[in-house]
Amino acid sequence: MSDILPLDVIGRRVEVNGEYATVRFCGAVPPVAGLWLGVEWDNPERGKHDGSHEGTMYFKCRHPTGGSFVRPSKVNFGDDFLTALKKRYVLEDGPDDDENSCSLKVGSKQVQTIGFEHITKKQSQLRALQDISLWNCAVSHAGEQGRIAEACPNIRVVNLSKNLLSTWDEVVLIAEQLKDLEALDLSENKLQFPSDSPTLTRTFSTLKTLVLNKTGITWTEVLHCAPSWPVLEELYLKSNNISISERPVNVLQKMRLLDLSSNPSIDESQLSLIADLPRLEHLVLSDIGLSSIHFPDAEIGCKTSMFPALKYLIVNDNQISEWSFINELDKLQSLQALSCTRNPLSKADKAEEIIIAKIAQLRTLNRCQILPEERRGAELDYRKAFGNEWRKAGGHPDPDKNRPNAAFLSAHPRYQLLCCKYGAPEDEELKTQQPFMLKKQLLTLKIKCSNQPERQILEKQLPDSMTVQKVKGLLSRLLKVPVSELLLSYESSKMPGREIELENDLQPLQFYSVENGDCLLVRW
């Protein structure tokens, strides 16, 4: 806190009693004597008015209770970069130590060191820093030119989130002294960005990661600044109310990751404007209200030219409720991983299995690896579940008669491919099971490992409608043996010594007349 005001006080970011604000006015507010600062709070509930007092408008606020008048002595205008860095990282003299003793401060931790020369130790400590965090340290400006470069020339990673930086120009003054800067986090600094492209310099020539969450930046401002980021690979723009208004032409061409989450103004049509980024592998679109997506350049069963390198897509917390969304994702030529949690579609029965069946090349779903046997099971279940619908739409096991209508092919683009892969569903598979009491469905079965007689015989209750494939999945988890290696048969309690193979993975236990008290025989 200081009674001396900065020359450029209007627009400065400040902190007052732990709350953040922007200075909008400096001057007298009659009839009360003295100098006042009019501030607009980040939290509008903190304020008292809209910038007016007794009928006179001194400044404007976006919210009717977003403004207050405060005395300059109550306002924290922050520290320069190096002062904040020393407060957090460097040696401080201990009040009771002798002249050869000092205490090392890292965050809030104090570590005593004996016998080191203070100044030399301080300088060497700063020069050794490469990865620093000045989160919430009230950094407001660069300070005297050249001092950062002299004191800490080896810094590569800087977290400056939640500070008092007011303008992009001030960020440039800091960054131009860090010649090896690779990653910079400026989140939660309400920054004023240049309205047109700044003069090209080498300030950010090594920058690969830039985090601008909650900075108030617009897409136009991103594109204005982007020529200064020639090797940028990761850009985070969460919670800025961004709308994508134009294509990034000759900029951001090396970007691999783009986070646009929590920007509700973004819609499906805007995504086409970034679809030509040649190296974009990772796209985060969580919490933007997304409900649909289309790649109009690709027909059913074909691949789109849009997002050619996209491998990882995150669309959590959206309004996705139609399977057509998932169908479209199968058109992406490079997609390997999808996260689609907390969407209306996620609540559908067997939603994850259906997603796996619909997207052929998917390797990871909701951060879980898709094993080959899991994919096979999902595709077989999908083929069976929609078999009757396929038949009604004109599908047929005979290739010469197999002509499902356009509506079915649109809703199930991969169904024909699955029939080619596994064969068309047989009549027996498509018969509807008649419902009956659950108690009658449950079978108490012994499970014996035939080639490992020393293993304890297990006992499990299984529904007789459970398919052989799902029984194998259960046994795979119990025995820690891959599904593909398991062979199943059973021995009837009514016919001791006779072994019956369970050779069709798609058939339920009841198909083989497995009964209560029978013994499943497992080999691998």
UniProtKB/Swiss-Prot annotation:
Where does each LRR repeat begin and end? 154-175, 180-201, 206-227, 231-253, 254-275, 279-300, 309-330
Pfam families given in the database record? CAP_GLY (PF01302), LRR_9 (PF14580), Ubiquitin_2 (PF14560)
Alphabetical UniProt keywords: Acetylation, Chaperone, Cytoplasm, Cytoskeleton, Leucine-rich repeat, Phosphoprotein, Repeat
Looking at the record, the residues that make up the CAP-Gly domain are 27-71
Give a brief account of the tissues where this protein occurs.
Ubiquitously expressed.
Q: Which SUPFAM superfamilies match?
A: Cap-Gly domain, L domain-like, Ubiquitin-like
Q: Which residues carry this modification: N6-acetyllysine?
A: 460
Record-level GO BP terms: adult locomotory behavior; axonogenesis; developmental growth; microtubule cytoskeleton organization; mitotic spindle organization; muscle atrophy; peripheral nervous system neuron axonogenesis; post-chaperonin tubulin folding pathway
Q: Which GO terms describe its molecular function?
A: unfolded protein binding
Q: Which residues carry this modification: Phosphoserine?
A: 492
Q: Where does this one sit in the cell? A: Cytoplasm; Cytoplasm, Cytoskeleton
Q: Which residues carry this modification: N-acetylserine?
A: 2
Question: What Gene3D superfamilies does this protein's entry cite?
Answer: CAP Gly-rich-like domain (2.30.30.190), Phosphatidylinositol 3-kinase Catalytic Subunit, Chain A, domain 1 (3.10.20.90), Ribonuclease Inhibitor (3.80.10.10)
Please name the InterPro entries in this protein's record. Answer: CAP-Gly_dom_sf, CAP-Gly_domain, LRR_dom_sf, Ubiquitin-like_dom, Ubiquitin-like_domsf, Ubl_TBCE
For this record, an example GO cellular component is:
cytoplasm
**UniProt keyword annotation of Acetylation present:** yes
The residues covered by the LRRCT domain are 343-381
What job does the chain carry out?
A: Tubulin-folding protein; involved in the second step of the tubulin folding pathway and in the regulation of tubulin heterodimer dissociation. Required for correct organization of microtubule cytoskeleton and mitotic splindle, and maintenance of the neuronal microtubule network.
Summarize the subunit comment: Supercomplex made of cofactors A to E. Cofactors A and D function by capturing and stabilizing tubulin in a quasi-native conformation. Cofactor E binds to the cofactor D-tubulin complex; interaction with cofactor C then causes the release of tubulin polypeptides that are committed to the native state. Cofactors B and E can form a heterodimer which binds to alpha-tubulin and enhances their ability to dissociate tubulin heterodimers. Interacts with TBCD.
Q: Which family does it belong to?
A: Belongs to the TBCE family.
User: PANTHER family attached here?
Assistant: CILIA- AND FLAGELLA-ASSOCIATED PROTEIN 410-RELATED, LEUCINE RICH REPEAT PROTEIN
Output this protein's name: Tubulin-specific chaperone E
